[in-house]
């Protein structure tokens, strides 16, 4: 059921999946009821081609990017953030502090300022859109629970039975070149990444490798 006047807030990471989700949402609900919410990151570690990709997707959809940024985002990278609080993460199962500071806190602040909720009531006039697919049911269940507890509903276009697009190249946009060497569009030097990612950083990004060693 389509709710008239509902705003669909796409958590637009700059990665391929969230871009495809954004296309599906705009095609189904319209650009006027869609918000592309992004967290701009330090240009030292968010590849310039990811920024190119975000702009091209925004231009194609006719929806400007709305930014919810951490203060100092343009000069502080993931290493700076963790050094400031003298920790990487609180426990083995917790989210890395860089994600919390660079994305989660600005996201929650933006929501509270623009679309405040009153849990346990769930707002019925907005929906938060994520690019999780049908193979990520554990992530979907977790996100549904977290956001519902905060008073928000969520939707997952990549799980819809009827899809209009599967690859962003179908609309003439190339996905970020980072996908040719990594399997994601996270920061170069992602603190959640494994050995393979860091071996590539060591080989191709000596400045980032050097800063990581000193952090």
Model-predicted segments: where are they?
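Nucleotide-activated chemistry modules centered on ATP-dependent adenylation/adenylyltransferase
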Residues: 2-215
